[in-house]
Amino acid sequence: MEELPATAIGLKVNDGIVLASERRLSYGGYVLSKQAKKVHKIGKFLMAGAGIYGDLQTLTRIMNVEIKYYEISTGKPISVHAAAKLLSVILYQYKVMPFISEILFGGVDEKGPQLYVLDPIGSLIEDNYAAVGSGARIAIGVLESEYDPNMNLDIAAQLITKAIKASIERDITSGDGIDLAIMDKKGNYENKFIPY
């Protein structure tokens, strides 16, 4: 499979999760936008991705609706794993004409922080850290050399920012600033933009 344009990174530590992505939207060497937000809060979850931007937007909308529907229907909140599995099923349903995207999905519930990686046909893998998109090979080296599950969220945010910056330096389809989403183990959410 060809690398999907963009870089998105997720990191799980004992204190919570951090997801980040750069903002460049490019197709075939042409920069279409420098303001493409690829990290989203969906209910009490975070989602980031690389790939066709319209597919990422559609998946975000679908997940917003499906999570709300589940919670209204059952009268209880959906767990992180169940929400990630729901996304996996949605992706698999479209396997003949897949969403051209790689997704990072995470959140915090009674089982603690969780991070999942999904490919275009719905493979679901739980991991401590992951990078997707065309800048992933660069970013993953930074993460592997410095990741520690015991680091606090501030250090985790610095590490993920360092990894995205490394990708921006070497990947032509990544750039134009960094969106950072942080969720602590109590479910508190913080969103930051870092110009770069």
UniProtKB/Swiss-Prot annotation:
<feature type="propeptide" description="Removed in mature form; by autocatalysis">
    <location>
        <begin position="1"/>
        <end position="6"/>
    </location>
</feature>
<dbReference type="InterPro" id="IPR016050">
    <property type="entry name" value="Proteasome_bsu_CS"/>
</dbReference>
<dbReference type="InterPro" id="IPR023333">
    <property type="entry name" value="Proteasome_suB-type"/>
</dbReference>
<comment type="function">
    <text>Component of the proteasome core, a large protease complex with broad specificity involved in protein degradation.</text>
</comment>
<dbReference type="GO" id="GO:0019774">
    <property type="term" value="C:proteasome core complex, beta-subunit complex"/>
</dbReference>
<comment type="subunit">
    <text>The 20S proteasome core is composed of 14 alpha and 14 beta subunits that assemble into four stacked heptameric rings, resulting in a barrel-shaped structure. The two inner rings, each composed of seven catalytic beta subunits, are sandwiched by two outer rings, each composed of seven alpha subunits. The catalytic chamber with the active sites is on the inside of the barrel. Has a gated structure, the ends of the cylinder being occluded by the N-termini of the alpha-subunits. Is capped at one or both ends by the proteasome regulatory ATPase, PAN.</text>
</comment>
<keyword id="KW-0068">Autocatalytic cleavage</keyword>
<dbReference type="GO" id="GO:0005737">
    <property type="term" value="C:cytoplasm"/>
</dbReference>
<comment type="similarity">
    <text>Belongs to the peptidase T1B family.</text>
</comment>
<keyword id="KW-0865">Zymogen</keyword>
<keyword id="KW-0378">Hydrolase</keyword>
<keyword id="KW-0647">Proteasome</keyword>
<protein>
    <recommendedName>
        <fullName>Proteasome subunit beta 2</fullName>
        <ecNumber>3.4.25.1</ecNumber>
    </recommendedName>
</protein>
<keyword id="KW-0645">Protease</keyword>
<keyword id="KW-0963">Cytoplasm</keyword>
<dbReference type="GO" id="GO:0010498">
    <property type="term" value="P:proteasomal protein catabolic process"/>
</dbReference>
<dbReference type="InterPro" id="IPR029055">
    <property type="entry name" value="Ntn_hydrolases_N"/>
</dbReference>
<dbReference type="InterPro" id="IPR019983">
    <property type="entry name" value="Pept_T1A_Psome_bsu_arc"/>
</dbReference>
<dbReference type="InterPro" id="IPR001353">
    <property type="entry name" value="Proteasome_sua/b"/>
</dbReference>
<dbReference type="GO" id="GO:0004298">
    <property type="term" value="F:threonine-type endopeptidase activity"/>
</dbReference>
<feature type="active site" description="Nucleophile">
    <location>
        <position position="7"/>
    </location>
</feature>
<dbReference type="InterPro" id="IPR000243">
    <property type="entry name" value="Pept_T1A_subB"/>
</dbReference>
<dbReference type="Pfam" id="PF00227">
    <property type="entry name" value="Proteasome"/>
</dbReference>
<keyword id="KW-0888">Threonine protease</keyword>
